């Protein structure tokens, strides 16, 4: 990855769902430099979720979407994570397992210092049982899980 390439580059992006005649995104331009933080704010239906899924390569389109100079659909770069809302409904994360065991099962032991900092910051208790916590607590566990590894690009939609 060249340090001079933007982290994200999208020009004149148009997207519409097959089931709709209206555009979800129309003429969208976005350039994010490495290390930048961007918060997408908009009304329901404005295209925030669609844009994040496109950037993550989770939804296909014919646009030229570059992440670290690579096309997300044809040669997706490594080092990208997408934390989406679907995760909270997954039966695996609603099982009878402690947060400690769950985080270890996804590699938390490899990043223990970073994991512990996130647990403290997000006020997550390792003894919580995943099937007994609220949706808000489950999303905090998801953030901890998703941010434990040092990703090059984190796309967070929760």
Segments and roles (model prediction):
Residues 1-36:
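A short, flexible loop at the N-terminus of ABC-type nucleotide-binding domains that lies
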Residues 41-43:
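The feature captures the beta-strand-to-loop junction immediately N-terminal to the Walker
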Residues 46-50:
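Conserved Walker
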Residues 56:
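Helix-to-loop junction immediately C-terminal to a conserved catalytic motif
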Residues 61-72:
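ABC nucleotide-binding domain "signature motif"
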Residues 71-141, 145:
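ABC-family P-loop ATPase nucleotide-binding domains
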Residues 147-152:
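A short, proline-enriched helix->beta-strand linker immediately N-terminal to the Walker B motif
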Residues 156-158:
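Conserved small/polar residues in nucleotide/adenosyl-binding loops
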């Amino acid at each position: 990855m060249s340090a001079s390439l933007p982290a994200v580059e999208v020009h004149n992006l148009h997207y519409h769902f097959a089931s709709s005649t209206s555009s979800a995104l129309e003429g969208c331009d976005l350039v994010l430099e490495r290390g930048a933080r961007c918060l997408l704010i908009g009304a329901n239906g404005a295209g925030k979720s669609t844009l994040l899924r496109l950037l993550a390569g989770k939804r296909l389109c014919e646009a030229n979407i570059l992440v670290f100079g690579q096309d997300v659909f044809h040669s997706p770069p490594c080092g990208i994570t997408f934390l989406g809302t679907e995760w909270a409904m997954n039966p695996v994360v609603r099982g009878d397992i402690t947060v400690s065991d769950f985080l270890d099962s996804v590699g938390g032991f490899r990043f223990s210092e970073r994991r512990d900092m996130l647990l403290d910051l997000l006020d997550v208790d390792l003894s919580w049982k995943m099937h007994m916590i609220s949706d808000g607590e489950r999303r905090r566990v998801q953030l901890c899980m998703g941010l434990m590894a040092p990703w090059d690009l984190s796309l967070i939609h929760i």
